[in-house]
Structures are given as C-alpha cells and as structure tokens.
Amino acid sequence: MQLLDNLDAALRKLDAQHLRRRRRTAESPCAPHVRVDGRDMLAFCSNDYLGLAAHPVIVAALAEGAARYGAGSGASHLISGHSHAHAQLEERLANMLAPHLEQPRALYFCTGYMANLAVLGALAGRDADIFSEALNHASLIDGARLSRARVQVYPHADLDALADMLAASRAQTRLIVSDGVFSMDGDIAPLRDLLALAERHGAWLVVDDAHGFGVLGEHGRGVLEHAGLRSPHLVLMGTLGKAAGVAGAFVAAHATVIDWLVNRARPYIFSTAAAPAQAHALMASLNLIEGSEGRQRRARLQALAQQLQARLSLRQWRHQPTPTAIQPIVLGANAHALRAAAGLESQGLWVPAIRPPTVPPGTARLRVTLSASHIPAHVDRLADALNQLDNEACHA
C-alpha cells in the first residue's frame, strides 16, 4: 500500500539521520533506581525533580481520592465532571500564588500542553500579536500557531529585539510568551525585564513554569517567586506531573482571565476532566512542596547540581551549568549524542540523547536531570562516567 510505503520511507530517512525515536518501558515506580526493559538502571532523565512521584503520603492520598471519587470524572468540567476535589485544588493553587498575582484564580488542566493551547487560543486571535521566545516549548509554539495571531519570534533572551518588536506593534492585544525555565537548557528567562516590557506596552506576559514550579523560590512557587514578581499582566502555567509528582497542569491569573478561559478555552471546554483522585493527591503534594520537607528537598537538589558542576571536567563536550535541576551536556552531532547515551547505558546509567526537533540542529545533547531523591554517590558515579566518555571522545 503506497500510503504505508511512504511512511516506511520517511522512517528510514529518520534512521539515516539518527533521528528515529523509540520508547523504553519502565517496569518500576519513578525513582533514581528503575527497571527499564528488564534491566536495573540509575536514571538521570525524569522530571520528578523533588522525588515526590512515589512519596508514600501522595500515593496514599491518590488511593484515598480514588476510593472517595472513583476512577474517573465522567464528563467535562462544564457538564458534570467538575468535582469538589478539582475545586479545592484550584482554590489551593490560587492561594499559593496570591503573592504574585492580583485577584488570583486557577484552572486545572489534564496536561501542560493542553493548558498552553488553551491560554493562547483564548487570549489571542487574528487581531493579536504574539511575541514568542525562540527556545519556547513545542506546546507554546503550537498554541501560538493555532491562535491565528501574528507570531513574531525573538532571539533567546534578546530583550532589545523584543522591545523593538513591541514598539512596532499596532495590535490591541499583545502577548509576550516565554518558558520560565527552558526545558532543554535549564536557564531561567529574564522575567523581571520581560514583565517591565509587558507593563510598558500593555501586553500580557504568559509564562510556562513547567520546570520551575515546586523547584524555585523559598516556598516552591516557581519562577514568579524566584524573580519576586507581582502583576495583573501575568498569566502563569505550571505543570503538576513534574516537581509535584502527580499529573496535570494549571493556569493561574487574575480572576477575569480565568473566567474568560472557562468560557472560551476550547481545550478546557471540550475535554473530559482529569480524575478527581489526581486533584486529591495534588493537595497532599502542594502541602509537601510548601512545607519544611519541600524546602529540604529543594536545598538537596541545589547541592546535587553544584556537586555535579564541580565534579565534571569535560574537554570535548560542553556542559552548561544552570541553577536548576536541568544540566545539559551538548555534544553537537546526533550520532555523538546517541553513542554517549549508549556508553552511559552500558554502565547502568540512563541519560537519553536529545536530538532535533526537540533542540536546534547541531546541538544534540545529553539532558541530565537531577532529583532530590538522588544521593551524592549517584552524582559521583554519573560524573565519573561522563568524564571517562568525554576523555575517550577526545582521543577518538
């Protein structure tokens, strides 16, 4: 059949470019030590930054929520799927972020991808201008495209270029859209400067804090707390399946923005609500994040990142130290990244290669992600293996 032949040819082309992707099967809970395809591995690739995914308090809360509310919601939020657990979670998130938003409310989504499509589709339209960061996540890129707004991409962290674009815009509705923590690089957006530009030009600042929420700030409130921001111009998206350890995402903003999303955000309106048990479990997760245990876990995570940075002595590869859990090591060629990942796997270390289109061509990398559940001995083992492989690459 010609249609299948065309797909087979396209897959063979991906193989030739070292770009074909295949799934691995984890057979154990998310933790530093995992069983993958029948083999025990030490993982440095999950987004479980605080090590909460298998926390007994959260696991117990999930079971309690399932016993109380059942396995599923049964309908969308605007029909009969909006449970007491969802309402409690949204109120809890709004209160948590109240120091950074005026008249805050929150909206719970099934995924971060859905949340970003919802925000950009509802706030922008044909007559709007979106100014999108060059290294934004795919969900922000797709959300901007689907909004039908005019999209301009500004170079990574280039505030002068963004200021020029804003000054030239004549649109009544303008949105500056940026990751808070860049998912493949681990650096933090210059949010204070972005907010200053948004307020000066009467624009929304939409921040995707998928990798900062729970990790950054004294109370784990993410990049807004880290940068000390408060403004009615802010629209925040955060994920709840990474540092929070469960699933889903939220949008937090001024109450009027949230009311508009409830009425106009198609991904929210036309999707079955997430299981109430997840929302119930997330209440336990947020208590841990904001409490003393959360502070201890964030401090441990920072110490592990500093340890890795101090222990690496790379000559051929390029490590980009960051203040977050994401520590990228750029190798360049796709084949080199795959070879390095295979070399680590042969030593029982799971660090997948990240290749285009996830990262720009020529910047294939190992994306090392740390968790508060790691211990210093884990980091030493990883650093020794990376230094060894880098040394071998120098002499290849």
UniProtKB/Swiss-Prot annotation:
UniProt-annotated binding residues for pyridoxal 5'-phosphate: 112-113, 183, 211, 239
Coiled-coil ranges (or none): none
Residues that, per the record, bind substrate: 21, 137, 358
GO molecular function: 8-amino-7-oxononanoate synthase activity; pyridoxal phosphate binding
Top EC group: transferase
Residues that span the membrane, as ranges: none
Cofactor: pyridoxal 5'-phosphate
Record-listed E.C. numbers: 2.3.1.47
GO biological process, one term: biotin biosynthetic process
InterPro entries cross-referenced by the UniProt entry: Aminotransferase_I/II_large, AON_synthase_class-II, AONS_Archaea/Proteobacteria, AONS_Proteobacteria, PyrdxlP-dep_Trfase, PyrdxlP-dep_Trfase_major, PyrdxlP-dep_Trfase_small
Catalyzed reaction equations: 6-carboxyhexanoyl-[ACP] + L-alanine + H(+) = (8S)-8-amino-7-oxononanoate + holo-[ACP] + CO2
Modified-residue entries (N6-(pyridoxal phosphate)lysine), positions: 242
Pathway note: Cofactor biosynthesis; biotin biosynthesis
Pfam families per record: Aminotran_1_2 (PF00155)
Keywords in alphabetical order: Biotin biosynthesis, Pyridoxal phosphate, Transferase
Subunit and interaction comment: Homodimer.
Function text: Catalyzes the decarboxylative condensation of pimeloyl-[acyl-carrier protein] and L-alanine to produce 8-amino-7-oxononanoate (AON), [acyl-carrier protein], and carbon dioxide.
HAMAP family to which the protein is assigned, alphabetical: BioF_aminotrans_2
NCBIfam families xrefs: bioF
Similarity comment: family membership: Belongs to the class-II pyridoxal-phosphate-dependent aminotransferase family. BioF subfamily.
Full protein name: 8-amino-7-oxononanoate synthase
Biological source species: Bordetella petrii (strain ATCC BAA-461 / DSM 12804 / CCUG 43448)
